[in-house]
């Protein structure tokens, strides 16, 4: 078993949501294992980052990779889009998986998006789920989607091809509320 590479970033300005402070950051492999002042690790590569800002990985909660719309496809697929995200400091993207109209299931929509993303992403990724058709099957699938890691659901009130009627909109919101979404 190979050892992981340790890196010690010294004297960087660590920026969090509510403060910034000069600290050291010890990284073991791909994990931050310690943040503090005057850290030492004799087996680590030391990098002086004095005067540099150290941010946690950013989250982009609204991406549209490999999306077919209006007779074209968005410029980035999951490979190029996540590479660009990483270059800009984003370590998690959340794209929109979508159920297709015409009797298609949420599961089919999620699987379609996983096929586009799995094995192609350079960063962590997740999905929102777009619900465009409400029926008994879709209602039964909500819990399964939550179990699959879906934490947010998108409902359209514009775009005629994606919109659900007001009665279904109410039913969907009521059902999602039962699950705490």
Language-model-detected regions and their locations in the chain:
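Histidine-rich, glycine-flanked metal-binding segment
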Residues: 2-57
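Metal-associated gating/positioning segment near the N- to mid-region
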Residues: 50-120, 137
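Histidine/acidic-residue-rich, glycine-tolerant segments that coordinate divalent metal ions
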Residues: 99-111, 116-181
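Short strand->helix junction
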Residues: 15, 21, 71, 99, ...
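Divalent metal-coordination and catalytic microenvironments
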Residues: 12, 30, 51, 62, ...
């Amino acid at each position: 078993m190979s050892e992981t590479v340790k890196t010690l970033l010294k004297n960087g300005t660590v920026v969090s949501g509510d403060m910034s402070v000069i600290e050291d950051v010890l990284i073991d492999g791909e994990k931050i294992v310690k943040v503090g002042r005057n850290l030492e690790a004799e087996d680590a590569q030391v990098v002086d980052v004095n005067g540099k800002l150290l941010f946690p990985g950013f989250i982009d909660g609204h991406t549209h990779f490999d999306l077919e719309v209006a007779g074209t496809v968005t410029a980035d697929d999951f490979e190029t889009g996540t590479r660009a995200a990483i270059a800009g400091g984003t370590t998690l993207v959340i794209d929109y998986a979508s159920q297709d109209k015409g009797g298609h299931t949420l599961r089919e929509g999620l699987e379609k998006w996983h096929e586009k993303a799995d094995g192609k992403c350079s960063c962590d990724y997740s999905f929102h789920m777009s619900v465009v058709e409400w029926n008994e099957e879709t209602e039964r699938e909500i819990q399964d989607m939550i179990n699959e890691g879906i934490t947010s659901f998108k409902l359209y009130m514009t775009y005629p091809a994606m919109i659900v009627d007001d009665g279904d909109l109410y039913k969907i919101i009521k059902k999602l509320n039962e699950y705490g979404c």
